[in-house]
Amino acid sequence: MQNWALVIGINRYWRADACLKGAVKDALKMREWLTSIDGGAVPSRNLILLLSPHDDPESCGGASALPATQDMIIQAIEQIFRKSGEEGDRFFFYYSGHGLTARMSFSNESGIIPNDFSDTLTNKALSLRSIFERFQSTRFREQFFFIDACRNIPWEGEREFLISQYPLPKPPKPPVFPQFIMYATSPGVKAVEIHEAGNERGAFTDALLAGLRGTGNAKLWHEEDREYMVRWDNLFRFVEEEVIRRRLSVSENRVPPLIQEPRQFGERGSCNPTLASLPAEVFPEVSLDVHLDPMTVASQTEVIVGDLGGVLRREFPVTALPVHFDLQPRTYSIRTSTPDFRSEKRYYQVDLYGPAEVSIKMVPGTGYSTPVSPSSGVSKSVDGNTATASVLMRSHDPLAYLELLDNSGTTIETGIGQIYRPRVKPGFYRLRLRTPEGIPHERLVELSSGESADITLDAPPQTDSGLFTHIAFTSHMYQGEPNIIQPSEAIGPAQSMHLSTILALAGGAVNEDSSYGGKLRGLGITSFRNIAGEEATSGMQILFGNEVTAPAFTDNYLSAVRLRCWGIDRGIPAEYRQPLHVADITGLAQATWEMEPGSYLLSIELPDRMPVVFPVAALSNRLSLLVVTQDATGVVNFFRYLPSLKDELPGDPRYEAARFPVLRRLEYIQRSCMVGRFEQAYQNARELLNAKWIDPMAGLLGSYLLMRLGKSDELCIPARNLSECFGELSDSHVIAAEYEAGIGNEEKAADAFRRALDNGLPIMSDCLTKLIYGMERYGIEHPRAALAKSYYSHGIKGLLWSACPRKACEAAPGETGADA
């Protein structure tokens, strides 16, 4: 199979002040790398180039290009599909030009702006998500998207904005092949051009091309192949660090200034593909300076530098500090040997891909001063014989996602909480802890021959996000470490928590009769039964958290929220409710409904967005718990849970003291799903699927992940459990239908799809999509078929949960007010 590419560069726009200078140049440079045999290895005939202007020999450098209009972008993609048969080894998509993020109710839709876009023809903007989704239905084994574009909302005061979708959609075909997406900047933020006369270029593309050429730490040395590799993870880290290093301000009159920061996205597992392989002789030596503290030990100290092949350089006696070495770029181990002192650490590792300094602290004593023979090194024992090593890596947090990688970035093993690898070759390894969003925190370690290492990884410090920090400190959840929170004794130390995590746990704790959860109940959230009555057995509770920093704005914002809830077969009610503020904590509010078991619709009307309607399932003896958070940048996230209202066993095998801790794991899974980290989410969901006690939300999320990962043959037990125990959930029957269809039971699949409609609408967007395709496949007629099709056709894309703008349901009613 072959590689394919679409390259787009747009300088010319509808107004002179909207035009760019460097986008076409960047696109031509990217085309040059893509068609190079040492780069993307895309045959010229397999690459389509779209430029604006496309017919100016001076700006286009003589390249043959087509105009970069919306129609031509779509036609170019379809042409690649026809020529390739929608399959290949790799597909590359590069875009340089203007972009935007349009606020679409509960989601922010990022799009590119073709040449024919204008402030009146705004529908010419093209949704990136819809392009990504279309490629998920193809068989390109690795898909790379590089987007050098702004993602800021285009005009001051514009809140809702239409971005056109890719007009020829197809559903994804599990298992979807991995997508690697790199954005020049964060949602809602500009991307900056570097203005040098005659050499204008995008800061992002400038760093990207440098990384693809192997600059700095974008590359890693592969010992077995004796060459450098530029892999995705290191490439993104290099681009991110390089753009941030330039501190490109993208805001005016803001303190602190808003800085351009690249972001990555994409549905992928632990894949870390190689984008370039480069020979050793291409790169010059780099400098390493070793400092000794105290300096007085220098005259009796030997400094030894080694790599995987053994000792490379020695310096004895040390006559001057720092000790200077010029070495080939790669990973090194530094040791010292001295009679009366030892280094504070046995060895010091350094990724030497740029000039570096290492300071070695020397303390009185012996212990690491065994003479090192010329044949010894990190891969050999002192006598020259190689013995395997072992490593136990763990986290303070039992739910943390861990990765063990070799020195070149190849994944060896992944796990939750800890990984034990008993027999590994001595050498350098990379130990990673990833947040639910996939942000890595890496530690480089060296395993010597025969060594048994026990290493605890720390997560990145908690982000200072205003309301979250206030709650954590005032509730005494911090335990002295900036990256560890302890929300309850039933949970213990936890990392990578968000405001949504605390609200989910608090919502669970206040609705459970447990001796645990005192800090969480102290937030002041009222339990469902304290509002609905002790006899209530089913209903809904919504928790709102707003992290905008201005208290007056936050209070006014939450006071303007309106909520409506009605039976699925009824009309939208005129009466609305408003959430009640949680006492003493600005930014928190709650609303509660008692409900009979059944299927409902919920309209959430935020003051700066279109009203959005979500399907809601009220289950017997369970609470439909919804958590809605808005961060300081205006991004709204929506989380769902179905905790029990009666006494039962805990649903999480790692937390047996109470039931509410399972909500933390479910929140982590949802956060990973929101950014496409499905393999990471599945590691956590798999334990819940195998647990003794069934949690309906764990079943839904776990089954969703099985389907996304192409593991539908494993749906048998989850589908049966959901259908038998939680048949009131429409999603349960969609999952059962998918399983039956997968094993060829067409009649049972059709019956299950009908039962899904009998029980309302699926609450998960993926299940709604599968229901629609099932209805079409089996010709299903049902009184709710039109409703399901309407929700699907008007649905808000990019959400984990089914949602539809309320205006797509029917005209808004007259309004009366009532508190929740």
Curated annotation (Swiss-Prot):
Molecular functions (GO terms): cysteine-type endopeptidase activity
InterPro entries for this protein: Caspase-like_dom_sf, Caspase-related_regulators, Pept_C14_caspase
Keywords, in A-Z order: Antiviral defense, Hydrolase, Protease
Gene3D superfamilies: 3.40.50.1460
Signal peptide positions (record): none
GO BP terms: defense response to virus; proteolysis
Keyword Protease found: yes
Enzyme Commission number: 3.4.-.-
Function: Probably a dedicated protease for substrate gasdermin bGSDM; cleaves the bGSDM precursor, releasing the pore-forming moiety, which integrates into the membrane and triggers cell death. Involved in defense against bacteriophages. Expression of bacterial gasdermin (bGSDM) and this neighboring protease is toxic in E.coli.
Family the entry assigns: Belongs to the peptidase C25 family.
Name of this chain's protein: Probable protease Ga0182885_104520
Species name: Desulfuromonadales bacterium
